[in-house]
Every structure is written in C-alpha cells, then in structure tokens.
Amino acid sequence: IEEVGKTFDVPSGATVIDAGGKTVMPGLIDAHVHVCSNGDPNVMTMLTFPPGLIQLFGAYNAVKTLDAGYTMIRDMGAPSGYALSLKKAIEMGIAKGPRIIAPGRIISMTGGHADFYIPSGVSYNEMSLISDGPIETRRSTRINLREGADFIKICTTGGVMSPTDPVDTPQYTV
C-alpha cells in the first residue's frame, strides 16, 4: 500500500484498488517464528535433514507466511544463519517472502536450552553458539554481529523444546 485517500495523483501504470466499503489494514508482523523449521515440535528431527532441505523449508515457509498476510517476521533462530541468508535473498528479489529480522545463531550455555547435544555424544550446534561466562558470550555476540544479525538471542532460562532444562531454570546471571 503506497497511499490511501479520497484524492491524490496516481502515477501512470500504478495499480489502483477501490477498497470502498472495505477495511484496509497494514501487513501483520509475527514476532516469534523459526522460518526454517518443518513444524515438527521435536526440534531434533531436523538433525536428520540435509542443510539444503532446511533452507528449502525456509523458502517455502517464507512464501506461505507472506501469502497469509504477514509482511514482517522476527525469526528466533535457525541453523547456520539460514534465516539471515533467506533475508538477503528476499532483499535481493531472488526469493519471495516477508521482511525478516533474525539473530543469527542462538547463544546458550553448555547444557542449556539451545545446546543440541545428544546422549550418543553427537553435538548439533549449527543452530547455536555455546557460551559459558561473559568472555565467551561477548565473543559469540561479536560472531553473530559479524555475520549480519539484527539482534542477539540469548537463552537465559530453560525452555519447552529442550529435554534437560525445565523452563524455570536460570541459565545466565547478571
């Protein structure tokens, strides 16, 4: 929507929509999404997907989100900066989707909400930067900013998606 009103100059070639008798509203904003997710509540399922498939979930979800009326989303974490790459592709016009703000990788303590360690000893931390203490946390913040993060997401408590840290467990202190 460029302009709304009763009278104004319309540039030649512009599309004019007569919305008389209708309600016109701005696009919606979703403030907490994981755009590259396949929607499975078990986040560990993504461990079985090749990186390209995770990126394609992001592109697919971006189109569906825009088609649903959301013109901006705040992604809250995706593996390896995929949401930041998707954001750039949308800005360049090579992908369709809403405007995206994204944090890069989530910052979590060892064993914390975004530490995707598996009891077999395998660790999948493409989605997070494990940071214990202020020095490591500052370094992780700098890495995210270097990679283009719009904001920093730090898991300060446990969460509902992680098996070993209840939601009321403090994980960082000031």
PLM ranges: what are they?
Residues 2-4, 55, 171-174:
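Short, intrinsically disordered, charge-balanced linker/junction segments flanking boundaries
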Residues 17, 30, 153:
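N-terminal Rossmann-like NAD(P) cofactor-binding module of classical short-chain dehydrogenase/reductase
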Residues 1-25:
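Histidine-rich, glycine-flanked metal-binding segment
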Residues 94-174:
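Metal-coordinating catalytic core of metallo-dependent amide/deamination hydrolases
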